[in-house]
């Protein structure tokens, strides 16, 4: 897998994780988390990284971790609309 593919996969994983969080979370909690954007709560970021199917070698790249976070925020923003 190339780095570019890992970035794309990370974004998709982030979206899936964000969608699952949004489904299970109360609306007020979601608004509070979105108000803190781009700072992601550390417990959610830890779950996102630990739950990733990507090899650790890719997770060490800033671009991949950024894509995970971006996917998460994209999913949360979609639920707000």
Outline where the language-model segments fall.
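Charged/polar low-complexity intrinsically disordered segments, enriched in acidic residues
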Residues: 1-63
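Short, charged, intrinsically disordered terminal tails
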Residues: 66-81
């Amino acid at each position: 897998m190339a780095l570019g593919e890992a970035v794309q996969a990370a974004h998709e994983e982030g979206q899936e994780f964000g969608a699952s969080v949004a489904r299970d979370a109360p609306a007020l909690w979601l608004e509070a988390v979105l108000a803190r954007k781009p700072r992601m709560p550390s417990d959610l970021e830890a779950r996102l990284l630990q739950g990733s199917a990507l090899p650790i070698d890719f997770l060490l790249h800033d671009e991949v971790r950024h894509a995970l976070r971006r996917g998460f925020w994209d999913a949360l923003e979609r639920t707000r609309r």
